[in-house]
Amino acid sequence: MSVSSSKQPGNDANDANSSVKGVSHLIIVQIIAKLLTFVLNQLIIRYLSPSIIGVTTYLEFICSTILFFSRESIRLSVQRVRNNSDNKDYVAQKVVNFGILAIAFAFPIFMVIGYWQLNYSSVMDKLFVSPFYKPVIVLFVASVILELLVEPIYCLYQFQLDFGKRSKFEGSAIFVKCIVSVLSILLARQYFVDQKFEGVAICAFALAQFSYSLTLFACYLMSFRFEFQNNKINYNLVKLKDENAREFYFEQDTLTIVKGFFVQMIFKQFLTEGDKLLISHLCTIEEQGMYAVMANYGSIIARLLFQPLEESTRLMFTKLLNENTRSQGDEKPQKSESHKCMQTFNYLKLISIFYFNLSLIILFAGVTSGPYLLKLLMGGRASNWESTDIFKLFPQYVVYLPFLAFNGILEALFSSMATNSDLKNFSKFMTLITILVLIFSYLLIDVLNLRISGLILANVFNMSSRIGYCYFKISKFYSKENVKVSFVDIVRYSCPSILITSIIWIIQLFIIGKNTTNFVQLILNACFSFVLVIILMVMERKNSKKPFEKVTNKFMKPKLD
């Protein structure tokens, strides 16, 4: 009996093709949903103060931290579950068991983070003196519980590379969240003012988050019951037997990987989200709100494009590179492994070219027009933020975005090819970097009083260190297959594009100046950016043609057959 007639794990071509088709749906839905979020948020930002945004952003960060620690190591590991049985229900149940493990992880994590927040968080002190703080806490806790309850189903769909369902479910949930937040804020504005409005506004965001989680829960649960009602897959922890009749709940090899990833995720969370922890202790509520708005507007491309690409790349590479562990009886393992290695390397070249050129365009357009665009988007509402340095700091955040992008894709590749030994070594490296980043951040933010500028510099150091480590490990991985990844070649390859970008920027500097200050200059910057895009496309046409053809031919082959 099969879990799903359309899913046949074990065929790397089908896996890759499924991943490519699925991620296209995921990217499209996420772009539409997040653009909708962006547009609807424009309707309410005029009513919100930096302190409201600071508190709500921090509460969302706490919820995401609990969810991250509870489930991320499992999400990274379930693709490694061995598909070593003809009974697809048996394999699916192994995956579901790991999803249940995420719920068990959550209880101690809830206790630790809850105690820490109640005793050491200045943001929570601010929340407790505001009206309606009790419903806020209840709604956020309930939303975390609901999202954890769907984790077994999420893991099953992820194992099957079924991005279609995820894109539909998340798109629906984001839409509901947007509508609830906008309507709640607009309604609260009619009946409350001053401090009471701030309390109700925070409660409105909590209600929106709860509606998001409830929608996800309903969609995943109904889908699971409809699709698997005739299969022998249980939504609970089931004791299984291996080929030697030994009973187990969790596949031992995969459980070892979960442990390795869990330790790694602790440090990754501190490094990735440590800026929010630092500013909660070193910055005022208003500064936190300013940084949240800047990050929200500045990273919209990262959230729309980079994040889906990173996740799909990690999943696809993991399935391809670990398929040999499920087919040890094949007569041509060496040929298959070498072929998979070259397939992933071609994809790596293609996506690196894309990321590099997109980063140049982001820097060229964002540094020049970013502050003006931010003012334009906020319109007459900008007066609420005049006392902050958000418009001066925004170009600095734009410079940070390429580091964020390359770190994300390289870590996705590294996690897909890492062994248990690699994960242990990476955990040690992350320990060292965590300590260095915390010290560096404290010195820049507090001692040198650079505030958010210091925070951005610390984040650049953080991402640069991780990029360097992942580059070294990825190069070492491919060198075993006699594929050379040379840093000198990368620099030589990058120089012409950087030179062209610099020349166009200098020309623009004489015509527009360092930053745009009016709509005419914004249009001129857009024209210069368009010219840069055309030139870069012409320059990269030959470089990207060969790897692009290899990747597309491989992925489209099942369709042609």
Swiss-Prot record:
Record keywords: Endoplasmic reticulum, Membrane, Sugar transport, Transmembrane, Transmembrane helix, Transport
Annotated GO biological process: dolichol-linked oligosaccharide biosynthetic process; glycolipid translocation; protein N-linked glycosylation
Location within or outside the cell: Endoplasmic reticulum membrane
Membrane spanning residue stretches: 25-45, 49-69, 95-115, 136-156, 168-188, 199-219, 350-370, 398-418, 429-449, 452-469, 493-513, 519-539
Keyword Transmembrane: yes
Protein name according to UniProt: Man(5)GlcNAc(2)-PP-dolichol translocation protein RFT1
A single MF term (Gene Ontology): flippase activity
Family: Belongs to the RFT1 family.
Domain of life per record: Eukaryota
Physiological role: Intramembrane glycolipid transporter that operates in the biosynthetic pathway of dolichol-linked oligosaccharides, the glycan precursors employed in protein asparagine (N)-glycosylation. The sequential addition of sugars to dolichol pyrophosphate produces dolichol-linked oligosaccharides containing fourteen sugars, including two GlcNAcs, nine mannoses and three glucoses. Once assembled, the oligosaccharide is transferred from the lipid to nascent proteins by oligosaccharyltransferases.
Pathways involved: Protein modification; protein glycosylation
GO CC annotation terms, alphabetical: endoplasmic reticulum membrane
Topology of this chain in the membrane: Multi-pass membrane protein
